[in-house]
Amino acid sequence: MAAGVAGWGVEAEEFEDAPDVEPLEPTLSNIIEQRSLKWIFVGGKGGVGKTTCSCSLAVQLSKGRESVLIISTDPAHNISDAFDQKFSKVPTKVKGYDNLFAMEIDPSLGVAELPDEFFEEDNMLSMGKKMMQEAMSAFPGIDEAMSYAEVMRLVKGMNFSVVVFDTAPTGHTLRLLNFPTIVERGLGRLMQIKNQISPFISQMCNMLGLGDMNADQLASKLEETLPVIRSVSEQFKDPEQTTFICVCIAEFLSLYETERLIQELAKCKIDTHNIIVNQLVFPDPEKPCKMCEARHKIQAKYLDQMEDLYEDFHIVKLPLLPHEVRGADKVNTFSALLLEPYKPPSTQ
């Protein structure tokens, strides 16, 4: 159409196309194809299949990237179960892959988690533990945040092409994304109270794995870490380098949690434009099942709501399977569903 609209110089067909927005492709192909991505977070409510999805994503990424690392920050450490292989705090090659590595960390273990028996030998040490706990409470989250900071420093030095985070349930995830702010705030608070806690600072540093140092040395170490932390923080807020994939199931509580998570991610300025809806029931017309049909109707209601609410998201629909996805071969098979929409029996 050659004519513009009412002198605005805009083609009429642009307006004609506007009302009917095509739904975005229901796959994670956009993630695989965006080669600028460095950090990919996979998270959501507990029990929705985050680990299976994050491991599957890592497998697909390994087919096109030079080196891929998947990190579990969930104390449950389910990636060992998913790949049927024991992983540790050190990146370990996943069996059957040359460029896929996995590691598990538990950043939530701080001084407060140490058993009382550790301090029984000396009353002074026992008192020291209480003092350390009081000191740590002055800047909550600093031990967990410093653990994240150390992991980030190590990971950045290893130069992986892309890092996938299999995150813990929502609360831990938001702390992970906010750790740069927590460390900066904690550093300021430490400078204010370092003279008060100086007698116990060496014990506290040993508990945090920071070696034997005084308050000034600890503050200096934190200041040295800040540039790395700030760099990571900037990357987290860059949609070209970082994105968050929400995993949920088609139920009210999970949908509510997903919306809350997306709102929090927006506040943190973290990009998110992909949702995986897992464990969907697709009735088999050749094998009628009242329970399956009832479940399918409930899920369909919430799926419709999600498609209305998140029309600017890629919504990936994954089926509930009759078996566990465990072992590298099964994870690899399941991972294909991230790129090729699942076809239920009734449509095959």
Curated annotation (Swiss-Prot):
Q: Any one cellular component term from GO for this entry? A: nucleoplasm
Family membership: Belongs to the arsA ATPase family.
Keywords assigned: Acetylation, ATP-binding, Cytoplasm, Endoplasmic reticulum, Hydrolase, Metal-binding, Nucleotide-binding, Nucleus, Transport, Zinc
Instruction: Supply the SUPFAM superfamilies for this chain.
Output: P-loop containing nucleoside triphosphate hydrolases (SSF52540)
> According to its UniProt record, which reaction does this protein catalyse?
ATP + H2O = ADP + phosphate + H(+)
Species of the source: Mus musculus (Mouse)
Quaternary state and interactors: Homodimer. Component of the Golgi to ER traffic (GET) complex, which is composed of GET1/WRB, CAMLG/GET2 and GET3/TRC40. Within the complex, CAMLG and GET1 form a heterotetramer which is stabilized by phosphatidylinositol binding and which binds to the GET3 homodimer. Interacts with CAMLG (via N-terminus). GET3 shows a higher affinity for CAMLG than for GET1. Interacts with SERP1 and SEC61B. Interacts with GET4.
Provide the binding site for ATP. K45, G46, G49, K50, T51, T52, E251, N278, P319, L321
Entry binding sites for Zn(2+)? C289, C292
Origin superkingdom: Eukaryota
GO BP, sorted A to Z: post-translational protein targeting to endoplasmic reticulum membrane; tail-anchored membrane protein insertion into ER membrane
- The entry's active site is D74
What happens when the protein's gene is inactivated?
Answer: Causes early embryonic lethality.
Q: Respond yes or no to whether keyword Nucleotide-binding is given for this record.
A: yes
Transcription recorded as keyword: no
Which molecular-function annotations from GO does this UniProt entry contain? ATP binding; ATP hydrolysis activity; membrane insertase activity; metal ion binding
Residues with PTM N-acetylalanine? A2
Q: What is its EC number?
A: 3.6.4.-
- Protein name per UniProt: ATPase GET3
